[in-house]
Amino acid sequence: MSWLKKLTAGLKKSSDKVSSSLSGISRLFGKGRIDAASIEEIEEALILADLGVSVASEIAEGLRARNWQGEVTPDVLREALAEQLTDILLPVEKPLTFKQAEGENDLHVILLVGVNGSGKTTTAGKLAARFQAQGRHVVMAAADTFRAAAIEQLSGWGARTETKVISGERGGDAAALAFRAIDEARADKADVLIIDTAGRLQNRAELMEELAKIIRVIKKQIPEAPQDSLIVLDGTVGQNAIAQIDRKSVV
C-alpha cells in the first residue's frame, strides 16, 4: 500500500471514529429536550470517542447543572459541549510570552514536535504569520530532514508569510541544522526562531534520542532554550495524546 493510501485510510479511520460517536449524540436531538437519560447517553458517547472517563464525567456533570428550557436544538447542545470543554481547558492554558530584547541570547526558540501528519509544519507557518503580524522578526528552520517535501512545504509557508526559512539537504543531521539556524537567526537579529522537526512516535527510542540531541545542541548555544516546546496533536487521537505528551516531556 502506498504512503498516500495509508494516510487516507488512517484519516478515514479517525474520522469514522469521531463521526460514529457524535452520531450517537446527534440522535438525541430528535427528543427536543435534555433529561437524565439523554445526558447519560451523551456521556457514554464521549467515552466511546476516547475522550476519557474523567473528562466525559465532568462534562456530563456540567450538563446536568444547566437549566435546560424549551426545545434543545443540535446547535444549542453543541455550544453547551464546547463551553464545557473550554471550561476544562482554560485553567491549563499557557500563553506564549516573550522577553524584552536585552542581548543576543534573547532569541526565543520554539521547538515543534509530534507524530507524523499531526500538522507541525502547518502550525509553524501559522505561528510565523501570527508573530509577523505582531511586528516580530521570525525565522523558521526545516529540521524535518526525513519526510519527502518537508523542506518544500515549510519553504512554501515561508513565502506566504515572508519569513526566512533555513534548511539543509534531505537526510542531513537535524541537530546540526538547528545549530546553524540559531547562528543565522542571531545574525539576522531575529526575535523568534521556529524549529520544525520530523514526526516521531513516542515509543521509538532512537527517534526520541535524536530529539534529545536537538535539544542538547540548542541549549549549548542558548541555555534557556527552547523556551517553548510545543507538541502538535491530532484532535481525534483520544487518550493516545496523553502517552505522546508524557513521553516527549521527559526528553
Predicted regions: what is each one?
Residues M1-G10:
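Compositionally biased, charge-rich terminal segments
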Residues K6, Q153-W157, E210-K213, Q244-R247:
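Alpha-helical scaffold elements adjacent to nucleotide-binding pockets in ATP/GTP-utilizing enzyme cores
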Residues K13, K17-A143, A149-G171, A175-I195:
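Primarily NTPase-proximal linker/entry elements flanking Walker-type ATP/GTP-binding cores
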Residues R147, G199-R200, V237:
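Short, glycine/acidic-enriched loop or turn micro-motifs at the edges of active sites
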Residues A150-Q153, L177-A178, N203-M208, N240-I245:
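Short, well-ordered secondary-structure micro-motifs
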Residues T163, E209-G235, R247:
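Inter-motif core of Ras-like GTPase G domains
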Residues D173-P223:
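Phosphate-binding/switch loop-helix module in NTP-utilizing enzymes
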